[in-house]
């Protein structure tokens, strides 16, 4: 990380670090349980202390019960005591880098905060780095409760 980079004040866009995280998410993707859609997704969540939590999508015959890779990884992070989440990476075999669904965007914002880096990637090597607040502008959050 280079916190002195004016284009990356949080030091979250280091290409080598992103390559490593994308590789971890890609590895997690191979464990996807997707017998209905055959659409495998992998994810990794990084905590500020450097721990990594992987996830893959887990489908169900009752489609609404399907778990997205991002939510699996976030759930693992929280269940293992991680509270200061830094980055979320998601990858799939798509033409463009894969964005999280609306439910995942809401959970990423809630658990990782508005400035968390979110990396959208595909198997072709394309990627987009954004933030959770950019993915979910005008979000409903605890301040409305």
Sequence positions of predicted segments:
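C-terminal binding/interaction regions
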Residues: 2-3, 14-31, 82-145
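Short beta-strand scaffold segments in enzyme catalytic cores
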Residues: 38-47
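Compact, glycine-rich, soluble single-domain proteins
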Residues: 56-72
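Intrinsically disordered, low-complexity tandem-repeat regions enriched in Proline and Serine
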Residues: 6-12
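Extended beta-strand/beta-hairpin segments
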Residues: 31-37
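Feature captures the catalytic cores and cofactor-binding loops of soluble hydro-lyases/lyases
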Residues: 72, 76-80, 106-107
